[in-house]
C-alpha cells in the first residue's frame, strides 16, 4: 500500500465536503498542538477539563480489539486512524497496518514515525476521507473505523459501507462505532466538539443496524462503552 501525506486535504466535491474539511482542520489543530480559542463557559465544562488533562480520550476511545483482535499477518485498514499505530498494540498483534486519515498532521506523524516503530507492520497511511477508499478490491482482512461516524449523517455512512465492502476480503470484519445519544457524556462531548470545530450528529442507535442491513451486511454483535457503541459487521459470502 502506498503512503501519502500531503500538506492539505484537497477540496471534496461531495455533499459532505464541508464537514470533511471541518473535521480535518479540527484534528490538525489537536495533533499539531495548536491552542483552541474557546469561550469561558466551554472551558468551565467538566468535559473540557478532562480533555485538557488528557483523561477524556482514553475513556472514550473504543477498544475494537475486544471484539475482534487482529491476527498475525492480517491486513488491517484503519479508517480515521489518527496516530493509532503509535499508541495501540499493533506490534503485539503482528498485524499489517494501513492507515487512512484526513488530518495532514496525523498523516505526517505516522509517515515519519511508523516505519521507525516497525517497518514490517507499517504499510503506510493514505490521506483521504472515509468515503473514498482507493485500494485494490479485497485487499484487507479487517477494516476499522472508530470515532468517525459521529461527525457525519447516516447517508454518508451508507457510502462508507459500500466502499468498505469493496476493499474487504470475503468474510472480513468491519468494526465501527457510533455515538450513543443517551450516554451521559454525549451532549457535553457534542458541545465541546462543535466548539472545537466539528459538529457531532446524535443519531438514534437503532438507525445503524438498519443502515448496515440496507447495504447487504449484518450486525453480528455490539458492545457498549462510555460514549460509543461498537458494531461488529460482516457481509455473508
Residue ranges: model-predicted function:
Residues 147-148:
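Short catalytic micro-motifs in class I SAM-dependent methyltransferases
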Residues 1-73, 82-132, 152-157, 173-237:
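Class I (Rossmann-like) S-adenosyl-L-methionine-dependent methyltransferase catalytic domain
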Residues 144:
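A conserved beta-strand element that flanks and buttresses the S-adenosyl-L-methionine
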Residues 74, 141:
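Conserved acidic residues
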Residues 79:
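Conserved beta-strand/loop positions that form the S-adenosyl-L-methionine
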Residues 158-170:
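A short glycine-rich, Lys/Arg-flanked "PGG" loop and its adjoining helix->strand segment in the class I
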